[in-house]
Amino acid sequence: MVCFRKDMEIADFEYPHKINLTKHVEDYLIEDENEVSNLWIDRKDMYMKENPDNKYSCKPIRLGIVNKGGQGERIYSVKGTAITLSANGGGVFAKTGGYYINGKTRRLHPRECARIMGYPDSYIICQSQNQAYKQFGNS
């Protein structure tokens, strides 16, 4: 929805053309397993879909849940788009959501969040991981 004040007398507004999405979460992932080793999550109360679709999508693809499946407790495919990053929130995958990567689940690394939000790899991320998640969740 787009609104203008009547006194502005704007009559020729046109919506911008649709932009097709070409990237998915997997395009932003860090390749070095050692750099993300502390982000892997393995819990007994993790429930995955039995036959997940392996297709690409321009939407987030939910594959499973942890606990009751609240915010921060959902598991997504890297073949979809990223869910909204959050500056606040809890759950085992707080602030980034969980992603199923190479047969395991994990949160996103702050660098991956930065990439998703459009920051270049040259951008210096603060030392505090929690503060970095808040920054990118507020971007």
What does each of the following model-derived ranges do?
Residues 1-84, 88-89:
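Class I S-adenosyl-L-methionine
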Residues 12-13, 97, 128:
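Short linear functional motifs in flexible/disordered or boundary regions
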Residues 90-97:
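Short, surface-exposed terminal/edge motifs of secreted or surface/virion proteins that either
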Residues 64-68, 99, 105-107:
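Short amphipathic alpha-helical surface micro-motifs
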Residues 101-128, 132:
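FAD-binding beta-loop-beta segment adjacent to the flavin cofactor pocket
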Residues 7-10, 98-104:
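Generic structural signal for short, solvent-exposed loop/turn connectors between secondary structure elements
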